[in-house]
Amino acid sequence: MTHRIAFIGLGAIASDVAAGLLADAAQPCQLAALTRNAADLPPALAGRVALLDGLPGLLAWRPDLVVEAAGQQAIAEHAEGCLKAGLDMIICSAGALADDALRARLIAAAEAGGARIRVPAGAIAGLDYLQAVAGRDDAEVVYESRKPVAAWRAELPGMGIDPDTLAESRTLFSGPAREAALRFPKNLNVAATLALAGIGMTRTRVEVVVDPRARGNQHRIQVRSPLGEMQIELVNAPSPANPKTSWLVAQSVLATIRRHLARFTIG
């Protein structure tokens, strides 16, 4: 069976995912993309990914699955229409879901259309553990994001920090996951994913650190409850095309697509 998969956005993550799908002969796919600029299409995907004109064009193409990888604004513009039309979605820009009103609208749209929303793990691990303790009022979750200067180069000047002279680590934010995800939409999707899987946007605590000595994009997750403790530390290689995100993210999205299409899954 050939699956029809449409992307919203065709940046670094979506391009890597599309290439992975096209290379998988065991799971043939037809691909299309809704993108603002046809020049975004990498040469390796030219002629292999159909370009769609707006949401009407996407709906007319009738995909089996829609993968959003274009940022939080794209979710506000397109997700509700896709879900109402009955199209299952994978949402990569999880930070948008920190907005309770938007999240409620998307869930209502999915219910109306009989669609499902999936959020990939992305750059992190341990979501199954967080889901297991989600209902406990006595659970504590702390997440630390520690990334090198390259991941924050565009934002640091606006915070009064010179990225070229920064020699020591600096804490950029300390507070609840909701505020972190909405304040830093290009860097903190992970915070929203953790909070949605676990104890919520308010109780999940987030520390954001820029560190010129960081070995890649580092993620530390600590969970404590009477059920036990979990500590996870990941050191992910940055994406060659976008240092704000981990190279692992595209593979996580690809794995989520394969689970969505599979008859047999684990986890």
Swiss-Prot record:
Coiled-coil intervals, chain numbering: none
Catalytic activity: L-aspartate + NADP(+) + H2O = oxaloacetate + NH4(+) + NADPH + H(+); L-aspartate + NAD(+) + H2O = oxaloacetate + NH4(+) + NADH + H(+)
Matching InterPro entries: Asp/hSer_DH_NAD-bd, Asp_DH, Asp_DH_prok, L-Asp_DH, NAD(P)-bd_dom_sf
EC number per UniProt: 1.4.1.21
A Pfam family hit: NAD_binding_3
Keywords associated with the record: NAD, NADP, Oxidoreductase, Pyridine nucleotide biosynthesis
Residue numbers binding NAD(+): 123, 189
SUPFAM superfamilies: Glyceraldehyde-3-phosphate dehydrogenase-like, C-terminal domain, NAD(P)-binding Rossmann-fold domains
GO molecular function, one term: NAD binding
TM region positions: none
GO biological process: NAD biosynthetic process
Pathway(s) it belongs to: Cofactor biosynthesis; NAD(+) biosynthesis; iminoaspartate from L-aspartate (dehydrogenase route): step 1/1
Catalytic residues (UniProt): 219
Summary of the function given for this chain in its UniProt record: Specifically catalyzes the NAD or NADP-dependent dehydrogenation of L-aspartate to iminoaspartate.
PANTHER family the UniProt entry points to: ASPARTATE DEHYDROGENASE DOMAIN-CONTAINING PROTEIN, L-ASPARTATE DEHYDROGENASE-RELATED
Other facts noted in the record for this chain: The iminoaspartate product is unstable in aqueous solution and can decompose to oxaloacetate and ammonia.
Family: Belongs to the L-aspartate dehydrogenase family.
Name this polypeptide is given: L-aspartate dehydrogenase 2
Source organism of this protein record: Bordetella parapertussis (strain 12822 / ATCC BAA-587 / NCTC 13253)
